[in-house]
């Protein structure tokens, strides 16, 4: 696969297949963020933060991307690169929706 094919495969996943299965990234990542927040605060009560640790949908996108980076570090599978591109796109869309400036 070349880079264009990887990006096209990621587009098919995040704009079609996966969205049909799991809903929009914003909604799905919000659900994951809420679950991770509860889990992490219960698991690591003295987390060094003031108050409750809050995981956001953008954090979910970045942590899922890091999971793919970890997998790529031990096994080069095209699917992991496709997923990495997809998580980056979803994270970018969420960030822009939150008001991050867009370079044009």
Residue ranges and their predicted role:
Residues 1-104:
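Intrinsically disordered, low-complexity regulatory regions
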